[in-house]
Amino acid sequence: MRRREVALPRDWWAAGLEGSRGLWELFGRRPASLDGAVCTRLALHSPLGVRAIVLLADAPDPLPRRWRTRGHDALSLKLSIVGCSLIRLSGPMPAHGCAVDIRPQAGGVRMRLHTRDFDALITAPIRGCIAHMKAYRRADGAPLLHL
């Protein structure tokens, strides 16, 4: 039996990331939104790579049964982008996190992190990946994911 490939929206922010199909399925075959998402951690990795922790404001509706059982109502993503062609940082990364914008571009990915005093632009000609997804209770604060 052949598995039918699911066609993800080409303009969806996660389209430039490996592992986006799992996110698509988790959200009931709808694109998870980046509106209100916050990047809480950013780490540079050699050679020419970055990892970031992004907390989504959006959540699956309805919540998966396992989430409801455990009281989870939010999702944290660990993103990895390697082979970066540009990593530009300006200002200190704020302790409370910053806004995040991710877009697919020409077979790769573009990520911008920003606040009033911080700006980061990261681009790569190859796809990044969603390295890990973790459900958590928003009231308990963000989970600690190691970069």
Where are these regions (language model features)?
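Surface-exposed, interaction-prone regions used to assemble/regulate multi-protein complexes
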Residues: 1-147
